[in-house]
């Protein structure tokens, strides 16, 4: 019988203690946050009587009958809160050279790091193992103390009790009970009504149109399953509130160096002719002008097309930043992307008190216009490529003239040793990166480019956090990073947070949002629902990652506190563990080995190459991270940073080495670490892997949107964007990472979170029943049949109850989320438009790609616009995606005309059944109405080829259907022939 050990306090590191009856001391019965009596008493004295984790109030009788069982040693501050020397390390500030070196390099190792503490770690590990053998009943506190290096004991200081040092940086604000309770009740009622509805539908077939009835029932069952997958992850939505002032009070004290964590920004671009350099420049400028310590910000721009235009535009951007950044910080302007700041139609003098503002703003606007002219000149020059290729200003050939065969390129702008702003202040570091490409190597598109940036940034700056942005998403809120740090740097909340996701907001969308480009329902409803479970999914941009989570590590384990009802019997009864998959056990052991290395080796210094490689077991790390000792050493530094004594030239060569085309071969890159390969929607796959490891994510919605971007408002471009997303979901469904079964044995992914991921991969398959269901109204009108038998009073009440429950669910969802009914209706319309076009094509293309090996190449959506406002909205571009919805529109319109004609011929009795069929057809037409408007364009004209193909398909379908008439039963045809014979007689 094993003795139950007391958990450790998450505030001071001491044992929590037990009550007189032997149960563990639990302060908060809602979340069981581990805190000892001494720390709890301090919280009460300071007037904060709420739980540090969940925010629920403590019970005042919690101190009764408690026996403290603490260690006699001094208080130990948890290592998670130690953000001193490692966070503030110099991030390769002396790099200012350009390097273009092929992948065949002789690595220069010899960085002086980590000697004394490795030896102390080894000694303590040996002592700990010997002590366990001699004294198996050693207390938990003594074992915990043995894991902490000696130097950390010497540097221990009592917890800071100044104002703001212990205040929580964020709180969870639950949805009011009056709103969420009624919402849940209606969901349960809708489930019950659905069960009764399907019982009626299945037990009351339509014999005269059995095929139509069966098709409709199958479609309705699929729609119900799809609704369950979408609805239940929204069961527990929450809101969050951050306190940036408390973050500053804790980590930015007057007269001291800022202790805020460093952040590496990733900006990706491929084709500068389709992703205008001016848009990318605005994104970069908004990053460089952030309200964040300049020595903590580094911006990496990935040019995956190796275009000289991208490089030259970045040179111009770095030069203009010397004027723009001090102007933004002096006058605290928002947003800090010049194109969008100067285009704002607001009173820009509001809240401005400096007399010089108007003059300097006018001068800055003139400078920006000159900057735009220079950028436009670069774009105009790049329209025609010289036969001999591009040449740089010094006369040498541009290394990236062959975009598929070129060396790796890195250029560092600005920063500590680079150019300063016009006021002489240091600017954030700006780095141009173009990874090596050679024929015969798989490059994995955007995911491969992001992984190359992960390695380059780890070698040069190694910030503990990474923020990735698309090139067309600029920073709209200069304090966005501080918002994320309120979660990630909180020692209580942020320990197991892998990333903070911000919602996507867009500029340049028409007021009616015809094609639901804003995705308001997804970002304001679904994502907030996921935040109440295990966190939102990763959506590809506007995300702040914890670097260690990208390296495949598991979150730090939390002490487990048993509930009071079971604590008394925990020594006698043990729960039988479920058998685990051997591959999962191996991966868990591998992660635990790496986690132990991080915990114990994260702060090592001054160690030679030979002994270091012996201690770290370098071979196993190389199989995971690749053949770079410098990069491997950076992965062991949990708080990031680069040693001061590192040779800058060595780092540049090493950075070139880690972006070589063959670096990822025989490693875990893209499989277990970094952005995950296997789908063109690498964002969903990457976030899914992190959640399967036990990490959680957080959804941050500041009042001022953190980031804003552009969206394709043209119908064809929008459908191609949706096609890409849907194809990625089909690829994940057909891969080994399918959420239906992947990670089930680990038990780290919560059930509702798994349902949400299942919904993200199966939604394209809804297109098959949706196309069939949208065709049924036309068939019913053309044949005179219907999918529902004559309704009784009870059946009518059932149908009415179903419609009311659907409406109530939507209304109550709008009530707690704040989404408008117009946004909800646009979302429903485009769900049908995308379902019968892009999703349908994605299903077939996905199966062809995954099963037959036929690859589908996607081009980057052009982000240029018409001179007129919303000019792109009215442009009609030919694509095969337009044919299915156009055909459905024509078929249903023909069916409505045929139905009214038939009713006129048959008389008064035919009008009653007609209304049900016409309502069914108009339901389809109303959902496709935005598509119809998009086809008409500004001049109300549709491409002739679309009209011809659609009319041809609709006509052939109608004629064949009337000729075959397959859903008329044989008894009907027999009776019809007999009647004809009687008439002849």
From Swiss-Prot:
Active site per database record: 304, 683
Polar residues biased stretches: 71-88, 148-164
Gene Ontology biological process terms in this record: cell wall organization; cellulose biosynthetic process; defense response to bacterium; defense response to fungus; plant-type secondary cell wall biogenesis; response to osmotic stress; response to water deprivation
Residues binding Zn(2+) 1: 9, 12, 36, 39
Expressing tissues: Confined to secondary cell wall developing tissues such as xylems and interfascicular regions. Expressed in young plants, stems, flowers and inflorescences, but not in leaves.
Bias (Basic and acidic residues): 136-145
Modification comment: S-acylated.
Protein name from the UniProt record: Cellulose synthase A catalytic subunit 8 [UDP-forming]
